[in-house]
Amino acid sequence: MQYTEVMVRYGELSTKGKNRKDFIGRLAGNVTRALQDFPEIEIHPKHDRMHIVLNGAPFDKIDQRLKLVFGIQTYSPTIKVEKNLDAIKKASLELMQATFKDGMTFKVNTRRSDHEFEYDTNQLNTMIGDYLFDNMDNLKVKMKKPDLVLRIEVRQDAIYISNQLLHGAGGMPVGTAGRAVMMLSGGIDSPVASYLAMKRGVEIDMVHFFSPPYTTEKALAKAKELTGILANYSGKINFIAVPFTEIQEQIKEKLPEGYLMTIQRRFMLQLADRIRAKRGGLAIFNGESVGQVASQTLESMVAINDVTSTPVLRPVATMDKTEIIKLAEQIGTFDLSIEPFEDCCTIFAPPRPKTKPKLDEARKLENRLDAEKMIQRAIDGMKITPIYPNQKFLDDKAQEDADLL
């Protein structure tokens, strides 16, 4: 089926009042980037919807990109025809023949913004319905919740016909809620938290801590490749690799075992906050879920959050692990997240970490270390890599090795 355009309907943009124009402009830019491999298309954002003129581009390939763009509620592949009855009949029949299957029910739903058109909505519904019955077999009408709705929109410039209502990613266009940093590990939770942050319109920079030689290049490559999967939903993401070896070694050497995780997380949060400030971010996101591990009890969060006044947001805070896994599978990060490359959160994990660390004790222990100089050395050693949708960093040999573990 050769469609002429795609009609895109906005989601929460309709509630944004005076900022609506800016939100629509951002969405148009995000759609343009997502479809940059199709130079023939034209994108026309309007107040109530967006028209993507295909000019011969295949809808099935456009569909694969469009469904990942946040800010789109629904969209429909559409045929645009001249404002005459024969053209409407022909396009309606083509659409129904391409999508109708035996046993399906349907109805015709006409809307007019051009009230000067010669036929009203009831007349068009009846005439097109009769024409379809005369030219197709096994049609059944159902007025409430049919399988197919043939939508005919009579506008000033033309008539638009569609019979599919496809669901988009919802949410807000990435970039409309400002910039933040995401503390990305190689696990299941933080990629899901990243997805949810972007869905609310946040443009994120990934901050990943690595500790060579305890963590391998493969672990770093895994985190980058996870970022490449997430970039499908936002376009390019900056990946910031922060060396963490010295800090971890000093903590392990000089501090009691029970507080290793607490102090380590305090350093991570301080580093993330410094990077946020340098890059103009407004918040810090992470993948913590309340009570899931020792560092994610409320007492631990109090002892760790003490190092910053910046908002620390946790999109998966109240989700069960099974809920997080289900979403990870849906967004395409789960299989890579469970590849067994150790990250810096696991290499020095004590057997009995404090689940209720005391804030005063955490402060006192951290003061035994030369925190400021170590933080600055880590900042000086960080590396920023732009990562693009589906960019690969793990070679086939690395994947084979992981499968054997």
Swiss-Prot record:
* Species lineage: Bacteria, Bacillati, Bacillota, Bacilli, Lactobacillales
State the coiled-coil residue ranges: none
Source organism of the structure? Lactobacillus gasseri (strain ATCC 33323 / DSM 20243 / BCRC 14619 / CIP 102991 / JCM 1131 / KCTC 3163 / NCIMB 11718 / NCTC 13722 / AM63)
Question: What family name appears in the similarity comment?
Answer: Belongs to the ThiI family.
Q: Gene that codes for this?
A: thiI
- By its UniProt entry, which NCBIfam families does this protein fall under? tRNA uracil 4-sulfurtransferase ThiI
Name it.
Probable tRNA sulfurtransferase
An annotated GO cellular component of this protein is: cytosol
Q: Which GO terms describe its biological process?
A: thiamine biosynthetic process; thiamine diphosphate biosynthetic process; thiazole biosynthetic process; tRNA 4-thiouridine biosynthesis
Q: Does the keyword Flavoprotein apply?
A: no
- SUPFAM superfamilies reported for this sequence: Adenine nucleotide alpha hydrolases-like (SSF52402), THUMP domain-like (SSF143437)
Question: What exactly does this protein do?
Answer: Catalyzes the ATP-dependent transfer of a sulfur to tRNA to produce 4-thiouridine in position 8 of tRNAs, which functions as a near-UV photosensor. Also catalyzes the transfer of sulfur to the sulfur carrier protein ThiS, forming ThiS-thiocarboxylate. This is a step in the synthesis of thiazole, in the thiamine biosynthesis pathway. The sulfur is donated as persulfide by IscS.
